Amino acid sequence: MSIVTEKDDPSLLGESNIAKKRPTKSRKKDPNRPRQSKPYNQRFRHGAGWPTIIWIGLIHLGALAAPFCFTWDGLIAAVFLYYLTGCVGVTLGLHRYLTHAGFKTYKPVRYALAFIGQLSGEGSALDWVATHRKHHAHSDQEDDPHSPEDGGWWAHIIWLAPHHTPAEKDELHMRWGPDLRKDRGMWFLHQTFILWHLVLGVALMGLGYYLGGWYTACSLVVWGMFLRLTVLLHVTWFVNSATHMWGYRNYETTDKSTNLWWVGLLAFGEGWHNNHHAYPRMAVHGHKWWEFDLTWNVLRVMRMCGLAWDIVDYKQKTKDGTVKV
């Protein structure tokens, strides 16, 4: 099944964000049409999205128990699952593959990446991809789902709080994620999003009990689920907020995307966000030698193993290290 990307539909990217061969001055915005931020009463016109609020709240509440049930087994579980669900699942699977089609792979790998990505707690693959494609189409404009132009806290977490009607959700899915919405496997994962977190939690508890009794079982659940999800959620949210507020820019796009080193490290290369907004389909986000991109190295290993091909890579670099197309 083909994947809808900005290559097929330019509105997924937005003409204003197509990078030039060399960095150029951003096109000026029309002074007669200032950006209009929607007031909160309009954003919450359908009320609060309590299922999402409760989901995020419970994750954070459970993470508070981490200092009281530390074990090395719990720490190992947290670090391993943070890498697996964050790097392999979110940045490689949901973002660079399913959203932007930065490479090709086998269908079983496609579903595996989507499944692992959903275990990040950030929503189903369908929700994640559709929202991110909409973000690229309207980056830092009125219809951007999470722009700091509407406030830093809005971009970081509050944007998740409003309730969206079934009709609004269906419109989001069909406009920005029709390839996933029409895929029965992806739709199944979408409908069973919570179930697989419960299964993982039970599996961690069983493993912990086997390794060291109930204390270790609680440790694996708290560290491997609640604390890991809390950290991963905020790191991903920093990509939405911090990398549109602070940092440096290699390319002059008309949004406010930036490169931020500490987000780059914590988010496995996603913090080189200005590079990504300049060339969204590129599977490599680090465009200068010091911009380390762990996800790109994972993809290189997949290519060597025959699990990835037709990778969208830069063709050459200019003398200053920026990408030339």
What are these regions (language model features)?
Residues 1-237, 282-325:
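Non-catalytic, topology-defining segments of multipass membrane proteins
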Residues 87, 96, 122, 264-275:
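Pore-loop/selectivity-filter region of tetrameric P-loop cation channels
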Residues 176-185, 246-272, 278-279:
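Active-site-proximal inter-transmembrane loops
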Residues 232-250:
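C-terminal accessory segments of proteins
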